[in-house]
Amino acid sequence: MAVYVGMLRLGRLCAGSSGVLGARVALSRSWQEARLQGVRFLSSREVDRMVSLPIGGLSYVQGCTKKHLNSKTVGQCLDTTAQRVPEREALVVLHEDVRLTFGQLKEEVDKAASGLLSIGLCKGDRLGMWGPNSYAWVLMQLATAQAGIILVSVNPAYQAMELEYVLKKVGCKALVFPKQFKTQQYYNILKQICPEVDNAQPGGLKSQRLPDLTTVISVDAPLPGTLLLDEVVAAGSTRQHLDQLQYNQQFLSCHDPINIQFTSGTTGSPKGATLSHYNIVNNSNMLGERLKLHEKTPEQLRMILPSPLYHCLGSVGGTMMCLMYGATLILASPVFNGKKALEAISRERGSFLYGTPTMFVDILNQPDFSSYDISTMCGGVIAGSPAPPELIRAIINKINMKDLVVAYGTPENSPVTFAHFPEDTVEQKAESVGRIMPHTEARIMNMEAGTLAELNTPGELCIRGYCVMLGYWGEPQKTEEAVDQDKWYRTGDVATMNEQGFCKIVGRSKDMIIRGGENIYPAELEDFFHTHPKVQEVQVVGVKDDRMGEEICACIRLKDGEETTVEEIKAFCKGKISHFKIPRYIVFVTNYPLTISGKIQKFKLREQMERHLNL
């Protein structure tokens, strides 16, 4: 029987007084622990010689295990690439006029890592990075990994209450940020919850509300109570501190925690998904392999990244994947800007582009879109939320992204677990989120019976493998709720799987509408409404109803300049979808309630609609 690779034994994570993980994370390679009743596991030979397919008519699939998982730390991966292609351009930050080769980037990262240790930070300490995309963000991402410090990805839009919550939750010892960006005054926001910073000695902060926070680092301006990032890097430039860094690295393990990614909070308070070097290195490596980066020339390895670095897609699929494959990471702007993204593609001869559906819509809708030279584009990734089929086709045909990959994942899974192959058809890319990634298992469970769902039958998607997080920082109970005894992570997403192993996300289990006993999945209806020529965007929610339990409400945003009526929309539905799926309520809206990271909060939309409809 084949050996199962990549099973993580979850330790309980707790942020006690020592601030370290409450239990060591071990790697289990036992088939006995991977038992799945009623399913015969594929041997490694069977898995490796074919595209991974479901087994026995049931919604279970195991990814290819032909290539070994990588046991290097992030720092070791940077060292390897810097030695292999030292003169190749590694990082371009257009809005800061920064250009670094891999050799130069490694040198700066080593100095920054050494500097962080020199000011008193230690392995396992948490450092929050709070700000938009910048050179400092990439530097801190790599320097913390090099030093064994855990990077906490802090949403740059956080206000005082949100900032206090995440810093307390993980016990941040250090916080790095710019003075301001647009109207976001970072230092002033911090002072609302930490007024002591104004009179503190740099590196010696003592805060009543943030007792763990001792060090505040300003990226770009001298501020009271803070260290300048340039000073920290300079402090790490001495031979003594660089030698100390090198000595410390022998105690780093690929299974050490490296990053805390906060979930977006669409259903409650954010949780800190904790990821290891092992999670991040292997996920980025496998995504690059799925994109076939190993087959590209250096000229074709130029990635435009408008996605935020505080998201997993940006930090893992962007920074880390470029590092693994010697690709050039190009940051077009501090926050997403469709025009700047197009300018970066044209000016920097970009070949790959990452983004969410909203970003791609904005890029395609730029008034001067046709004036940009996008001839060098060949592929990229769309992820973050469901994308309607017509958008997929527009990206492939209009942005020249023939090798577009639709990817699916969650922060808890490092993040990508399903993605297309570049050669998959437009129809396959438009109708699914692709096939299982290597060294990953997926199953879809019947939510009522608790058994494996048959193919093409909706159920909750569960994931197992190397990619599953270490846990939610400081929340062992929520970790146990999310990851069961057999190490299956419950995504909360409702999905189907077909005979070829393609996965389609139907909706969120919490968003499922039960109308008179019928299960209705909002994503299915949203896909349908996107075929209406006047509809720009639509969100479907369930609203309370005394007789049916729930009724369907479609919240439709029309394209600019378009007009229609409720009656016309309902007439469009007749004969095309089942009568019980036709929304009882249709409301035309101009926007949706969003999290600060831009995700639609359906529970708030539901509340708004129930008030609007006087239910």
Swiss-Prot record:
Pfam families per the UniProt record, alphabetical: AMP-binding, AMP-binding_C
GO cellular component: mitochondrion
Keywords from the UniProt entry: Acetylation, ATP-binding, Fatty acid metabolism, Ligase, Lipid metabolism, Mitochondrion, Nucleotide-binding, Transit peptide
BP GO terms, sorted: fatty acid metabolic process
Principal localisation: mitochondrion
Binding sites annotated in the UniProt record for ATP: T263, S264, G265, T266, T267, G268, S269, P270, K271, D493, R508, K599
Subcellular location: Mitochondrion
Its EC number(s): 6.2.1.2
Modified residues (N6-succinyllysine): K182, K478, K544, K570, K599
Catalytic activities: a medium-chain fatty acid + ATP + CoA = a medium-chain fatty acyl-CoA + AMP + diphosphate; octanoate + ATP + CoA = octanoyl-CoA + AMP + diphosphate
Signal in keyword set: no
Positions carrying N6-acetyllysine: K179, K182, K340, K398, K510, K544, K570
Stored PROSITE patterns: AMP_BINDING
Transit peptide residue numbers: 1-41
GO terms for MF: ATP binding; medium-chain fatty acid-CoA ligase activity
Enzyme class: ligase
Purpose: Acyl-CoA synthases catalyze the initial reaction in fatty acid metabolism, by forming a thioester with CoA. Has some preference toward medium-chain substrates. Plays a role in adipocyte differentiation.
Family: Belongs to the ATP-dependent AMP-binding enzyme family.
Name listed for the protein in its UniProt record: Medium-chain acyl-CoA ligase ACSF2, mitochondrial
Record organism: Pongo abelii
Highest classification ranks of the organism: Eukaryota, Metazoa, Chordata, Craniata, Vertebrata
Gene giving rise to this polypeptide: ACSF2
